[in-house]
Regions:
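Juxtamembrane/interface segments of multi-pass membrane proteins
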Residues: 139, 173-175, 204, 221-244, ...
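Extended ligand-binding groove/face enriched in aromatic
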Residues: 90-91, 95-192
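Alpha-helical positions within canonical tetratricopeptide repeat
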Residues: 33, 84, 88, 138-141, ...
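Cleavable N-terminal signal peptides of Sec/SRP-targeted secreted and luminal proteins
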Residues: 3-19
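CBM-like carbohydrate-recognition segments
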Residues: 20-115, 119-121, 127-128, 180, ...
Length: 466
C-alpha cells in the first residue's frame, strides 16, 4: 500500500473518532443525530439576525435554495416528530409568497427562474401533504400556493422554441433566458404529479405527461442510455444538448413518476421510475455511497447550489422507495450506506458536528461546509425513517406500495386538510409586463449573477466533455 494511501486512511480514522455515529436501525438514534444536523442547518438562517430577511439564509445562498431548505426542515419535523422549528418554517414559507401569493416576490426578480419558483411550490405541496399547520383564514393555504406556482409556471410554456418546454429564466433581462433547462421542466412535472395525486384533477395529469413527453422528445430524458438525464438545451439550437447530469434532476423525475404510479396504478410510471433508478445506480453511487458525479471527481468543483443537490435527490428517492416496492430494498440499502457515510463527515465546525461534502472518504474539510452540506446530510439520514411507524405514523404498506386512507403523503381524500383553488395564481400579473423599477445597473447585476451560476454549472461539469 502506498504511503499516501496510509496517510489518507489514518486521517479518515481520526475523523471518524469525532464524527457523529448513528445506529441506522434505531429510529431514536437517527432522530437524535438529525436534530444536531438540523441545528447546524439553521445556523445559516438569516431571518433571526439583525437586518436579516425572514425566509432567507445568509449570503451566498440564493432564494431558490432557501425554498429547498425549508422542505428539508419540514421533512425533519415529519420524520422525527421534532417541532422545534415549525414556527420558523411556517413564517418563512408565508413571508416569501409575494404580493400575488404565487412565490414571485418582486425583490427576487433579478435572480428568480422557473426552477426557483418551482422548488418553493414543491415545498408548499409537501406542507399540504403532511398536514403541516395550516395558515390563518386570511392567509394563502399550502395547496393554494402550490396550485398558484403550477398555474403561473404552466402559463409560461413556450411552443415557439424547441416545440415546447419552460425556459430557465422567467424574466427576459436575466442571462439564461435562452436556455431551457431540465430542472425547470422537472419541477413542473413533479409538482403536476403531486397535485394530481392530491386533488384528482386530470389537468395536472395532462401537464405531467406533457412535461415528460417534451423532455423525452427533446433528448433530455434519453431512454437509450438508462435515462441519464441531461441538463438542458439552447433555444437557438434545440439539438444542442448540455450533457451534464445532476442528482436533483433525476430525483425530480423518479419522485414524480412514483407519485403518478401511486395515483394511477399505471405501470408506465413504475417502469419509467425503475429505468431512471437504473441510471442513478450507474451514475450517482460508488460502493452504495451517494456522489454528485458531475462535480465530485478526483477534484471537487461543486458550487454552492450543487452542494445541496444530494439533499433533493435523497428526498425524492425516498418517495420512490415508499411507492415502488420493486426497487424499495435497493434504494433503502443505498440510503442507509449514504447516511452512515455522510455522518462520518459531520465532525467539524465550532459545534463539532458540522457536515462536509465528501461521503466517499468520510473526510471533513473546512473548504466544503455550508447550507448544502447540512441539507444533504439531514435528508439522506431522515429518509431512513420513511417506513418507521413511530416517526412517520401515517405510512402503511401493501403489495402496491402505499395506498388507501390515513397514509402519508396525504391526499384530499385521505385526510389532507389544506384547501386550494384550481384558478390560484391565474389572475396574477404577467411577470414580463410588471411595472418593475429595474434600473440598467440592476439588469447588469442580474446578468452577472445568472452568468456566474451558468458558468458554475458548465465549469463544474468539465469532465463530461473530456
Amino acid at each position: 500500500m502506498k504511503f499516501s494511501r496510509l496517510i489518507s486512511n489514518a486521517l479518515i480514522a481520526l475523523t471518524s473518532v469525532c464524527a457523529l455515529t448513528v445506529d441506522i436501525d434505531d429510529p431514536d438514534s437517527i432522530a437524535q443525530n438529525a436534530a444536531l444536523i438540523a441545528q447546524g442547518l439553521m445556523n445559516y438562517y438569516d431571518g433571526h439576525r439583525y437586518g436579516g430577511v425572514v425566509g432567507m439564509f445568509v449570503f451566498p445562498y440564493y432564494w431558490w435554495e432557501a425554498g429547498a431548505a425549508w422542505n428539508s426542515m419540514l421533512d425533519f419535523w415529519y420524520y422525527t416528530g421534532n417541532d422545534t422549528y415549525n414556527d420558523v418554517v411556517k413564517e418563512a414559507l408565508l413571508y416569501q409568497v409575494g404580493k400575488n401569493n404565487d412565490y414571485l416576490p418582486v425583490n427576487q426578480s433579478t435572480t428568480e427562474g422557473n426552477d426557483d419558483q418551482g422548488f418553493w411550490g414543491i415545498t408548499a405541496m409537501a406542507a399540504a401533504e403532511k398536514n403541516f399547520s395550516n395558515p390563518g383564514k386570511d392567509e394563502p393555504q399550502w395547496l393554494y400556493l402550490a396550485q398558484a406556482v403550477f398555474n403561473t409556471m404552466s402559463a409560461r410554456w413556450d411552443t415557439d422554441h424547441c416545440n415546447g418546454g419552460l425556459r430557465w429564466q422567467i424574466y427576459t433581462w436575466n442571462n439564461g433566458y435562452d436556455y431551457k433547462n431540465t430542472v425547470s421542466n422537472g419541477c413542473l412535472f413533479h409538482l403536476a404529479a403531486r397535485l394530481y395525486r392530491y386533488t384528482g384533477n386530470d389537468t395536472y395529469l395532462h401537464w405531467a405527461e406533457k412535461a415528460w413527453d417534451w423532455c423525452e422528445q427533446s433528448g433530455l430524458l434519453n431512454k437509450e442510455d438508462n435515462y441519464h438525464i441531461r441538463d438542458g438545451v439552447d433555444v437557438n439550437n434545440c439539438s444542442n444538448i448540455t450533457p451534464y447530469v445532476w442528482t436533483y434532476n433525476a430525483g425530480l423525475f423518479i419522485g414524480g413518476s412514483a407519485f403518478l404510479y401511486n395515483a394511477t396504478s399505471d405501470d408506465t410510471w413504475a417502469t419509467r421510475a425503475k429505468n431512471i433508478w437504473t441510471g442513478c445506480e450507474e451514475l450517482f453511487f460508488q460502493d452504495d455511497k451517494m456522489v454528485e458525479i458531475s462535480c465530485q471527481q478526483s477534484r471537487i468543483t461543486c458550487n454552492n447550489d450543487q452542494r445541496c443537490f444530494k439533499a433533493i435527490f435523497s428526498r425524492f428517492i425516498g418517495y420512490a422507495a415508499l411507492f415502488l416496492p420493486d426497487i424499495r430494498d435497493d434504494i433503502m440499502k443505498k440510503l442507509r450506506a449514504s447516511a452512515i457515510a455522510a455522518l462520518q463527515t459531520c465532525s467539524g465546525g465550532s459545534d463539532g458536528h458540522t457536515c462536509s461534502i465528501d461521503w466517499l472518504t468520510g473526510a471533513y474539510s473546512n473548504d466544503w461546509i455550508g447550507l448544502g452540506e447540512q441539507m444533504s446530510a439531514l435528508e439522506v439520514l431522515q429518509n431512513n425513517l420513511i417506513f418507521n411507524p413511530k416517526m412517520a405514523p401515517n405510512v402503511t404498506t401493501n403489495e402496491n406500495g402505499t395506498t388507501g386512507g390515513g397514509i402519508g403523503p396525504l391526499t384530499h381524500d385521505t385526510g389532507g386538510t389544506s384547501e386550494g383553488s384550481p384558478d390560484a395564481g391565474s389572475s396574477s400579473a404577467n411577470p414580463l409586463l410588471m411595472n418593475l423599477d429595474i434600473k440598467g445597473s440592476d439588469k447588469a447585476g442580474a446578468g452577472v449573477l445568472t452568468a456566474v451560476l451558468l458558468i458554475g454549472v458548465l465549469g463544474s461539469g468539465w469532465w463530461m466533455l473530456a
